[in-house]
Structures are given as structure tokens and as C-alpha cells.
């Protein structure tokens, strides 16, 4: 049987050969599709999506097909690093997605897709287009976000990617709002009784181990914002605020402003409070960000094609010199043309320090 177990503290899903009958039916269905074929696997958390992906990839390899896998479960990534969508090509049998060598990544910048629908859809689209050039079958493993906004996210992915087959792992028709209208390309599969459920704390611990492993053998690299494209933040958009404007804002709100930009008629400032107490700030006029929250912020290091070559942790920033000091395991920095700011703070030991709302930065 296929089992979901915790092994060495880093992964949940592993391959075995005994599977429910409907998994064989799924493999037969995929084998009969016109190639290249794209298959999207959906289901709630802890329904065996990754386990199914592993089984199908191994079975299809045995049948002589070229297979690729897109791991888009940003919060429970098997193909490192977290907070990205990753593509790997399968050239031999394997037992865990962690065994695969990633070919390309797309940076999302957080471990929850709720405020990042654009990145989630575009990332899977770009990687699927790339994968189809070299694969007979593209298997897309997805997040367990299937309720509320998750319905719209899954439907947007289906509309954008146009999969040839949707494999729906469900218990009691909970996927109906997602697959309604796509029944002709959907195959429903039952959730195995052997699937293990993981608590929030267990998931966080799994992520901690993966962050820690990813940042092993990292080094500090310096980037200059004047020499590289910086996205995912308003910090370097618009024009610098004038000294008089800076002084006025500091007096009004009891701030020390370390960096400020004027974006049309609005201001964006990075500040430190100089006194305690409440402040009434019209965020339609002034957006502000606490300097301390820049520490250990996750950054994506992108190439000219928009693919993520790896991620880094912001360790220091010098606004006057435009200098960013980034801890990263990425070796070839020469191909990095863009730095994209994420919305999770994490240390290199894997400890997550918190998520940021998309609009704050």
C-alpha cells in the first residue's frame, strides 16, 4: 500500500507498490491520453496527493513515458526550497520527491497562497509550459487549499493550465465546487484509509527541518539595488522623499525615517518608532514599515527568464549605499538579474519568525 509517514523528520510521502485499485485506473487513463499530457492532482490536506504523485510517476516511468513533476505545495514542499513552486524531471524510479533534482523554480515568497493567487497561477503555468517541452506526462501536485478562496484558486489554475486530466482525491464530494464544469476531464479517487494526518505543529517542524537543510553551506552575498532589478516591494519605486517631507513626517508620527519614497501622491517609509503610544496614520497617504521586520526576510533570486535560482535571507540593508546583504546557498550569482521580496521571515536554522501581509511592503 502507499503510505504517508514521517521519515527522518523531513518528509511525509514515500513510495510503495501496493495501491488501491483506482490508482491503477488512473495510471491507465493517463497512459491513454494524447501526449504531452498535463495531470493536476487536487484534494484536501492529508489526502495523499504527494503519495499519489510518487506512485504515478514511478508507474509511468515503468511504462516508458518521460515524466516531470511540479511541486506547487508551497507550505509543505518536498522539492526544496519552501515558498517556491518547483519542477523536476524524473529519469529513474524514486521513493520520495526529495530524491529528485530540481530543474527550475518559481518564487512565490510565502508558505500560504491566500494573498498570492497571481504567483501561484503564473508559476505553475510557466513551469508546465517548460515541462511539456521535455515530457510525455506532467504531474502537478497542489496545495490542500480547497475551501473559500481555495476554490477560486484551483479553478483559476484549471482554466489557465487546461489540464488533460484532473485527479480528485476526496472523501465526501468536498471538491464539487472546484470540479463542477470540469467533470469530463475529472477522475475521482477515494482517499486511502492509510493516509496519516499531520498537525499544524508537525507541519511547521517538517518545514523547519527543510529550511535548515536548504540553508546549509550558505554564504553572505552583497547586491546593490542600483545594479539589479528589485521587485515585490515599494521600497525602491517612485522618487526619494524630500528632506522637508521627511522631517515633517518624523515630527508628526514620532518616527526616525531610515528610508522614504514618494509614489505619486502617497508616501512609503521605513521607520523606527522614537516613542511609544498610539498613532493615527492615514494609510491612503502614508504607508509605513517597521525596519526591524526587514531582518531575516525571505528573498527570491531570479534569472533573466523570471525563474528562481534559489532563495536567500536578508541579513542587512544599507539604504544610503543601496546595499543588500543576503545569506544564500546559490553559488552562481552572476546569473541573478532580479531580487524579489517575499512575505515570510525565517532564520537559517529553520525557525519561522512570521508572515507579512502582501500590501505592507
UniProtKB/Swiss-Prot annotation:
Under Gene Ontology molecular function, one entry of this record is: ATP binding
Please write the reaction equations for the catalytic activity of this protein: a 5'-end dephospho-2'-deoxyribonucleoside-DNA + ATP = a 5'-end 5'-phospho-2'-deoxyribonucleoside-DNA + ADP + H(+); a 5'-end dephospho-ribonucleoside-RNA + ATP = a 5'-end 5'-phospho-ribonucleoside-RNA + ADP + H(+)
- How does the activity vary with pH? Optimum pH is 4.5 to 9.5 using 24-mer 5'-OH DNA as substrate and 4.5 to 6.5 using 24-mer 5'-OH RNA as substrate.
Species this protein is from:
Pyrococcus horikoshii (strain ATCC 700860 / DSM 12428 / JCM 9974 / NBRC 100139 / OT-3)
Query: This chain belongs to which protein, by name?
Result: Polyribonucleotide 5'-hydroxyl-kinase PH0197
What's the short name of a Pfam family annotated to this entry? CLP1_P
Instruction: Give the function comment from the record.
Output: Polynucleotide kinase that can phosphorylate the 5'-hydroxyl groups of both single-stranded RNA (ssRNA) and single-stranded DNA (ssDNA). Exhibits a strong preference for ssRNA.
- Recite the UniProt keywords alphabetically: ATP-binding, Kinase, Nucleotide-binding, Transferase
Signal peptide range in chain numbering: none
Annotated consequence of substituting residue 73 to A: Abrogates kinase activity against both DNA and RNA
EC code(s) of this entry: 2.7.1.78
Entry note: thermal dependence: Optimum temperature is 55 to 75 degrees Celsius using 24-mer 5'-OH DNA as substrate and from 55 to 85 degrees Celsius using 24-mer 5'-OH RNA as substrate.
Q: Which GO terms describe its biological process?
A: RNA processing
Amino acid at each position: 500500500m502507499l503510505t504517508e509517514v514521517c521519515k527522518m523528520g523531513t518528509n511525509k510521502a514515500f513510495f510503495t507498490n501496493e495501491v488501491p485499485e483506482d490508482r491503477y485506473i488512473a495510471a491507465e487513463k493517463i497512459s491513454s491520453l494524447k501526449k504531452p499530457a498535463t495531470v493536476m492532482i487536487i484534494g484536501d490536506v492529508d489526502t495523499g496527493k504527494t503519495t499519489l504523485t510518487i506512485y504515478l510517476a514511478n508507474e509511468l516511468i515503468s511504462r516508458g513515458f518521460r515524466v516531470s513533476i511540479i511541486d506547487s505545495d508551497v507550505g509543505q514542499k518536498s522539492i526544496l526550497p519552501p515558498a517556491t513552486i518547483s519542477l523536476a524531471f524524473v529519469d529513474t524510479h524514486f521513493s520520495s520527491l526529495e530524491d529528485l533534482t530540481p530543474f527550475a523554480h518559481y518564487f512565490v515568497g510565502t508558505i500560504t497562497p491566500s494573498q498570492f493567487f497571481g504567483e501561484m497561477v503564473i508559476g505553475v503555468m510557466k513551469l508546465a509550459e517548460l515541462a511539456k517541452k521535455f515530457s510525455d506526462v506532467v504531474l502537478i501536485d497542489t496545495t490542500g487549499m480547497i475551501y473559500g478562496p481555495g476554490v477560486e484558486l484551483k479553478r483559476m489554475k484549471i482554466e489557465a493550465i487546461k489540464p488533460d486530466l484532473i485527479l480528485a482525491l476526496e472523501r465526501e464530494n468536498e471538491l464539487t465546487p472546484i470540479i463542477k464544469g470540469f467533470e469530463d476531464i475529472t477522475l475521482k479517487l477515494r482517499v486511502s484509509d492509510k493516509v496519516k494526518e499531520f498537525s499544524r505543529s508537525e507541519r511547521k517542524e517538517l518545514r523547519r527541518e527543510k529550511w535548515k537543510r536548504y540553508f546549509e553551506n550558505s554564504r553572505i552575498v552583497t547586491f546593490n539595488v542600483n545594479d539589479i532589478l528589485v521587485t515585490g516591494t515599494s521600497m525602491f519605486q517612485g522618487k526619494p522623499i524630500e528632506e522637508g517631507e521627511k522631517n515633517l513626517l518624523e515630527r508628526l508620527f514620532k518616527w526616525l525615517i531610515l528610508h522614504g519614497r514618494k509614489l505619486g501622491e502617497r508616501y512609503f517609509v521605513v521607520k523606527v518608532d522614537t516613542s511609544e503610544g498610539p498613532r493615527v496614520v492615514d494609510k491612503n497617504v502614508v504607508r509605513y514599515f517597521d525596519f526591524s521586520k526587514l531582518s531575516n526576510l525571505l528573498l527570491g533570486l531570479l534569472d533573466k527568464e523570471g525563474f528562481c535560482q534559489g532563495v536567500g535571507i536578508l541579513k542587512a540593508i544599507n539604504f544610503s549605499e543601496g546595499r543588500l546583504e543576503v545569506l544564500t546557498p546559490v553559488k552562481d550569482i552572476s546569473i541573478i538579474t532580479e531580487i524579489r521580496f517575499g512575505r515570510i521571515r525565517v532564520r537559517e536554522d529553520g525557525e519561522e519568525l512570521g508572515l507579512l501581509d502582501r500590501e505592507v511592503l
